[in-house]
Amino acid sequence: MAIERYFIKEGVKEMLIDEFLEKELRRAGYGGLDIKKTPLGTKVTIFAANPGYVIGRGGRRIRELTRILEKQFGLENPQIEVEEIKNPYLNAKVQAVRLAQALERGIHFRRAAYSAIRAIMRNGARGVEIRLSGKLTGERAKSVRFYQGYLAKVGNPAETLVSRGYAQAQLKLGVIGVKVSIMPPDAKLPDEIEIKEIVEEEVSANEAQ
């Protein structure tokens, strides 16, 4: 039970750090983080479309983030690395944050969702799903789903191949939850066969039957 409590505590801590970094690094195109314990302390990898913003002028911002992760969140000797997101349109976290920002700017939820889906698919995604939950049009909360293309929903492919991201939009009517799921262009399903070129081969009489 002690081990279970430890992992629950660590999971909650990582979630709180993710929420903090999302707010601090929205202008950097924040796309999530990875936390790993090492013999020397804690390695924190921040994924961002604009690494320069995370680092800051003269390294000022990354030093401040390091201090906060250690003092406020209790990470042992945090070492921050920043990894650039090559294509932000295929990172679900980046897209969730951008969609939340669009909603906060007053763009209608349907227009914002369709615009995001078109941009994601134009960048080669095999499929995308967007779920918006909250008071979208009035006092009554509801959930709306938008999708296009193919997206693995269950099993190992859904867990390992699909990029998922979550963000929140703070509106006058309340908080809107934004969930984005993206199937990237290079996702290969276990039972999928892809033939790029026409193949010609001889077949024996027995095989032909």
Curated annotation (Swiss-Prot):
Keyword flag Magnesium: no
GO BP annotations listed: translation
Physiological role: Binds the lower part of the 30S subunit head.
Gene Ontology MF term list: rRNA binding; structural constituent of ribosome
NCBIfam families: PRK04191.1, uS3_euk_arch
SUPFAM superfamilies (alphabetical): Prokaryotic type KH domain (KH-domain type II), Ribosomal protein S3 C-terminal domain
Ranges where the KH type-2 domain occurs: 17-86
Assembly and binders: Part of the 30S ribosomal subunit.
The keyword Nucleus is assigned to this record: no
Transmembrane residue ranges: none
Name under which the protein is recorded: Small ribosomal subunit protein uS3
Family, per entry: Belongs to the universal ribosomal protein uS3 family.
Keyword list, A-Z: Ribonucleoprotein, Ribosomal protein, RNA-binding, rRNA-binding
UniProt-listed InterPro entries: KH_dom, KH_dom-like_a/b, KH_dom_type_2, KH_sf_prok-type, Ribosomal_S3_C_sf, Ribosomal_uS3_arc, Ribosomal_uS3_C, Ribosomal_uS3_euk/arc
Top-level taxon of the source organism: Archaea
A GO cellular-component term linked to this record: cytosolic small ribosomal subunit
